[in-house]
């Protein structure tokens, strides 16, 4: 696919971070499904061991730029960006602009100020907008009868709201993308217009999607505070107990430090501890709801933690009782056809991951993995016309596209349609297993330190 240079660039700055003691996450997003990422040390997750799919990362039938997001220690992320600037030249590296927009409450206050209306009046109207994500003024008028009444009876309110609705959603100000960095072969200003932020940082004047459309190389350097906590906890353990703990060991490599202790990801004591729900401070597992879920789940493997992180989200949460019942009562699990069993057995008969949708259409209907990723994408983005067309292909096949179809594989029409319906329902919310696996490793690492070295872990957590 011609991405050798891309992987080498990513490997280079990750290698710089590791060799300079800057904590790097085990992986993030679909890149953890790449064996090349694993063997080069870009990620620490073995995709074969956890059955992660490469085509979820790069699809040979829908060629796009790879997207490897990397988590670094929150406090030292800037050092990695500085290294990239020095290596490739300040003229060839830039951060990316973002545009803040006039949202419902903000636009009312801004328009009111321009109209010279009293601040208290505008603030009262703005506070009547419900605190809902992506709320619009029009939706607020439908949801709040009091606001609707004022709009219909007060000319000042009506003028303010009508003008605000016309401006709602327009760009208000610029800021810098929290993670995006662009690297170019020639001077950046030969490709895109640039600007200088208030702190002197050079940024593109094009947003991230435009940068990607132009074919420029975009990387995401993210800061994850938990990595700092883990590093500080490991340092305190060595200082207090003389024990070195290697959290970044990759299985296929020779262990370079014979004195270091490796974390056992099948440690029953750590898994049982997670199952007690005493996971305050444990990455991804510290909310009240997640603690209760862990008490019900009682994970027995890292796979259970991966599934837990994937399920505890709006939508998939409805399947938690079925998942737990299947885990505890294996005899209660049923499959529409025998071909589903090896795919869904690890998740007790439930579709939990996007990768499982891909495996189902490949194994049952004969899609290629590239075609399977395309249908997974269509389902997650709710492209109904694609979903309807693919149902025909899934059930009956499509000779022109090389799809055999379920019926040709001995699966009944009724069962095939039922399986397809369940995929459509769940694919809207299904989680990327590669990302869940990487973050489950971080969750487990924090639980490991909290269980075995609670003093050092809590000191690191409070310091951060």
Annotate the PLM regions.
Residues 1-464:
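Alpha-helical scaffold/interaction cores of sigma-54-like transcription cofactors
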């Amino acid at each position: 696919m011609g991405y050798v240079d891309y992987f080498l660039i990513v490997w280079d700055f990750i290698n710089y971070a590791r060799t300079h003691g800057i904590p790097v996450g085990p992986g993030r997003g679909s890149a953890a499904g790449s064996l090349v990422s694993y063997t080069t040390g870009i990620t620490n997750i073995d995709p074969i061991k956890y059955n992660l799919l490469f085509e979820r990362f790069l699809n040979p039938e829908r060629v796009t730029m790879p997207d490897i997001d990397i988590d670094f220690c929150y406090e030292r992320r800037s050092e990695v960006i500085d290294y990239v600037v020095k290596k490739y030249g300040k003229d060839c590296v830039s951060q990316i602009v973002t545009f803040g927009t006039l949202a419902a409450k903000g636009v009312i206050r801004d328009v009111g100020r321009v109209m010279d209306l009293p601040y208290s009046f505008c603030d009262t109207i703005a506070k009547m907008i419900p605190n809902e994500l992506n709320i619009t003024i029009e939706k607020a008028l439908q949801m709040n009868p009091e606001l609707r009444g004022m709009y219909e009876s007060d000319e000042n309110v009506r003028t303010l709201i009508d003008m605000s609705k016309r401006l709602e959603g327009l760009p208000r100000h610029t800021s810098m993308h929290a993670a995006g960095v662009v690297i170019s072969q020639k001077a950046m200003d030969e490709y895109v217009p640039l600007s200088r932020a208030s702190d002197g940082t050079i940024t593109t004047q094009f947003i991230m999607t435009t940068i990607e459309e132009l074919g420029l190389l975009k990387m995401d350097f993210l800061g994850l505070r938990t990595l700092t906590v883990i590093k500080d906890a490991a340092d305190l353990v060595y200082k207090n107990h003389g024990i070195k703990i290697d959290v970044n060991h990759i299985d296929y490599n020779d262990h370079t430090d014979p004195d270091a202790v490796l974390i056992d990801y099948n440690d029953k004591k750590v898994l049982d501890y997670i199952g007690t729900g005493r996971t305050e401070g444990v990455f991804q597992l510290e909310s009240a709801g997640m603690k209760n879920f862990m008490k019900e789940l009682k994970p027995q493997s890292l796979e259970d933690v991966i599934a837990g992180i994937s399920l505890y989200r709006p939508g998939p949460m409805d399947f938690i009782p079925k998942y737990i019942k299947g885990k505890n009562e294996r005899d209660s699990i049923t499959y529409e056809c025998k071909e589903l069993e090896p795919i869904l057995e690890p998740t007790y008969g439930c579709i939990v991951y996007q990768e499982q949708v891909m495996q189902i259409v490949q194994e049952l209907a004969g899609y290629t993995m590239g075609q399977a990723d395309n249908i997974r994408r269509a389902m997650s983005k709710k492209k109904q016309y694609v979903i309807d067309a693919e149902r025909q292909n899934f059930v009956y096949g499509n000779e022109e596209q090389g799809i055999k179809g379920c019926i040709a594989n001995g699966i009944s029409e009724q069962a095939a349609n039922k399986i397809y319906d369940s995929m459509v329902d769940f694919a809207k919310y299904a989680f990327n297993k590669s990302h869940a696996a990487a973050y489950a490793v971080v969750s487990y690492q924090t639980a490991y330190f909290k269980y075995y070295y609670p003093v050092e872990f809590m000191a690191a957590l409070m310091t951060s």
